């Protein structure tokens, strides 16, 4: 099973990716995780990426493609993989097509932007442990404090409403066109194109999971 998971930032791709990867025994390839690891390590590419991400922009194609090409060459990708957050742009999709990367499905998780803003701007985290909360959906026992240590929770810059809105704007301009790209390719050349499927990403985690797994068996 080789697939791309599409959807706006905050659409719940990471949660559903974990279920899909478990079901099919494939690795999740998240450019976000790869970038955060580079930022944490303080590599030159990581430092570049940090400045771009904190301004709400997207990292360059060259940097992302170098990370991804290296990743899918690893042995654990032999039986398939799930791309979460890649490709982000038409040029990236073209580059992947040109490289002959075989894909079975493109699955879109569709969530209204108003829901995404509420989801993301309400996130809070405890930096030392990585524990996460949500002011509405998963609040801490004491407002603004970690349940275990009582230490202050923070709002990541990535989750501030202004940054979220900027990221959604960038998504609309650069990544949303991939929906048309893959659906048009599937209609024009069904023999070689991945199957394109879209599901609603609003509802319980379990409901969305069942929609996703049903879409990937159709």
From Swiss-Prot:
<feature type="region of interest" description="NMP">
    <location>
        <begin position="30"/>
        <end position="59"/>
    </location>
</feature>
<dbReference type="InterPro" id="IPR027417">
    <property type="entry name" value="P-loop_NTPase"/>
</dbReference>
<feature type="binding site">
    <location>
        <position position="123"/>
    </location>
    <ligand>
        <name>ATP</name>
    </ligand>
</feature>
<dbReference type="InterPro" id="IPR007862">
    <property type="entry name" value="Adenylate_kinase_lid-dom"/>
</dbReference>
<dbReference type="Pfam" id="PF00406">
    <property type="entry name" value="ADK"/>
</dbReference>
<feature type="binding site">
    <location>
        <begin position="10"/>
        <end position="15"/>
    </location>
    <ligand>
        <name>ATP</name>
    </ligand>
</feature>
<feature type="binding site">
    <location>
        <position position="167"/>
    </location>
    <ligand>
        <name>AMP</name>
    </ligand>
</feature>
<dbReference type="InterPro" id="IPR006259">
    <property type="entry name" value="Adenyl_kin_sub"/>
</dbReference>
<feature type="binding site">
    <location>
        <position position="156"/>
    </location>
    <ligand>
        <name>AMP</name>
    </ligand>
</feature>
<dbReference type="InterPro" id="IPR033690">
    <property type="entry name" value="Adenylat_kinase_CS"/>
</dbReference>
<dbReference type="GO" id="GO:0044209">
    <property type="term" value="P:AMP salvage"/>
</dbReference>
<comment type="subunit">
    <text>Monomer.</text>
</comment>
<comment type="similarity">
    <text>Belongs to the adenylate kinase family.</text>
</comment>
<keyword id="KW-0067">ATP-binding</keyword>
<comment type="pathway">
    <text>Purine metabolism; AMP biosynthesis via salvage pathway; AMP from ADP: step 1/1.</text>
</comment>
<dbReference type="GO" id="GO:0005737">
    <property type="term" value="C:cytoplasm"/>
</dbReference>
<keyword id="KW-0963">Cytoplasm</keyword>
<keyword id="KW-0808">Transferase</keyword>
<keyword id="KW-0545">Nucleotide biosynthesis</keyword>
<dbReference type="GO" id="GO:0004017">
    <property type="term" value="F:adenylate kinase activity"/>
</dbReference>
<feature type="binding site">
    <location>
        <begin position="132"/>
        <end position="133"/>
    </location>
    <ligand>
        <name>ATP</name>
    </ligand>
</feature>
<keyword id="KW-0418">Kinase</keyword>
<dbReference type="InterPro" id="IPR000850">
    <property type="entry name" value="Adenylat/UMP-CMP_kin"/>
</dbReference>
<dbReference type="Pfam" id="PF05191">
    <property type="entry name" value="ADK_lid"/>
</dbReference>
<dbReference type="GO" id="GO:0005524">
    <property type="term" value="F:ATP binding"/>
</dbReference>
<keyword id="KW-0547">Nucleotide-binding</keyword>
<feature type="region of interest" description="LID">
    <location>
        <begin position="122"/>
        <end position="159"/>
    </location>
</feature>
<feature type="binding site">
    <location>
        <begin position="57"/>
        <end position="59"/>
    </location>
    <ligand>
        <name>AMP</name>
    </ligand>
</feature>
<feature type="binding site">
    <location>
        <position position="92"/>
    </location>
    <ligand>
        <name>AMP</name>
    </ligand>
</feature>
<comment type="function">
    <text>Catalyzes the reversible transfer of the terminal phosphate group between ATP and AMP. Plays an important role in cellular energy homeostasis and in adenine nucleotide metabolism.</text>
</comment>
<feature type="binding site">
    <location>
        <position position="36"/>
    </location>
    <ligand>
        <name>AMP</name>
    </ligand>
</feature>
<feature type="binding site">
    <location>
        <begin position="85"/>
        <end position="88"/>
    </location>
    <ligand>
        <name>AMP</name>
    </ligand>
</feature>
<feature type="binding site">
    <location>
        <position position="203"/>
    </location>
    <ligand>
        <name>ATP</name>
    </ligand>
</feature>
<protein>
    <recommendedName>
        <fullName>Adenylate kinase</fullName>
        <ecNumber>2.7.4.3</ecNumber>
    </recommendedName>
</protein>
<feature type="binding site">
    <location>
        <position position="31"/>
    </location>
    <ligand>
        <name>AMP</name>
    </ligand>
</feature>
């Amino acid at each position: 099973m080789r697939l791309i998971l599409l959807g706006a930032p905050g659409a719940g791709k990471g949660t559903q990716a974990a279920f899909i990867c478990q079901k099919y025994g494939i690795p999740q390839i998240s450019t976000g995780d790869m970038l955060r690891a580079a930022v944490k390590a303080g590599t030159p590419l990581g430092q570049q990426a940090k400045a771009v991400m904190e301004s709400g922009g997207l990292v360059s194609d060259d940097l992302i493609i170098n990370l991804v090409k290296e990743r899918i060459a690893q042995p654990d990708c032999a039986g398939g993989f799930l791309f979460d957050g890649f490709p982000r742009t038409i040029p990236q999709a073209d580059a992947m097509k040109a490289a002959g990367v075989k894909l079975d499905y493109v699955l879109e998780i569709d969530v209204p932007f108003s829901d995404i803003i509420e989801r993301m701007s309400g996130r809070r985290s405890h930096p030392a442990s990585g524990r996460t909360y949500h002011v509405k959906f998963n609040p801490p026992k004491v407002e603004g404090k970690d349940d275990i240590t009582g230490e202050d929770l923070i709002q990541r810059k990535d989750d501030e409403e202004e940054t979220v809105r900027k990221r959604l704007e960038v998504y609309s301009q650069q990544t949303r066109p991939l929906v048309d790209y893959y659906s048009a390719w599937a209609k024009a050349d069904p023999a070689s194109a991945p199957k394109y499927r879209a599901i609603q990403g609003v509802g319980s985690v379990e409901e969305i999971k069942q929609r996703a797994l049903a879409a990937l068996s159709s």
